[in-house]
Amino acid sequence: MNQDQMKKAAAEAAIEYVESGMIVGVGTGSTANHFIDLLAAIKDRIDGTVASSEASAQRLRGHGIQVMDLNTAGQLPLYVDGADESNAELHLIKGGGGALTREKIVAAASDKFVCIADESKLVDVLGAFPLPVEVIPMARAYVARELTKLGGQPVLREGFTTDNGNVILDVHNLQISDPVAMEDHINQLPGVVTVGIFAQRPADVLILGSAGGIRKIG
């Protein structure tokens, strides 16, 4: 199996968590796209979806799947999304696709968060993948200086604006040994909308696609 096939295998395993009558939270990115495409086959069984990005909403609608506003949908039973990294505690780095704030909101509003990924995403310590931080534009330089004090090297994601109209700083070379504390600290910086550490609300289940099949943690 190549990496894309591993992602699809993880997405197929996540479909098993979808029950009739659910409103399903749906993430963003290449692995989540596999889940969306598979969800199309059972779209008549669910009551709708909540998307974590405009891109995912468009893909869902392209399959004829209803997309609802989270404020209307209320508490969700299930959220399925990918990750850029996960540790053994199911703390994640997310936001490579730029949808981290909406992803974090939908995850917080969901009873169960099933994370799907290929096996390369499981790491001992978070931080090899550059950590995305969504920032209000006027605070970009200030937040970058503060992130540098933490030992990271923040780089503006050039030519990219989030669905919320903000910018992203990708922070390189951070060793995130305490994800919960780091998430809290960065989120406290004025001008930060959210950081792409998902530790205070980690995944409940991690499904990894591998050459040998599926592995579940949690």
UniProtKB/Swiss-Prot annotation:
Its EC number is 5.3.1.6. GO terms for cellular component: cytosol. It comes from the Bacteria. SUPFAM superfamilies: D-ribose-5-phosphate isomerase (RpiA), lid domain, NagB/RpiA/CoA transferase-like. Substrate binds at T28, G29, S30, T31, D81, G82, A83, D84, K94, G95, G96, G97, K121. One of its GO terms (biological process) is D-ribose metabolic process. Transmembrane segments: none annotated. Pathway: Carbohydrate degradation; pentose phosphate pathway; D-ribose 5-phosphate from D-ribulose 5-phosphate (non-oxidative stage): step 1/1. NCBIfam families: PRK00702.1 (NF001924), rpiA (TIGR00021). Belongs to the ribose 5-phosphate isomerase family. Homodimer. Catalyzes the reversible conversion of ribose-5-phosphate to ribulose 5-phosphate. This is Ribose-5-phosphate isomerase A. It comes from Thioalkalivibrio sulfidiphilus (strain HL-EbGR7).
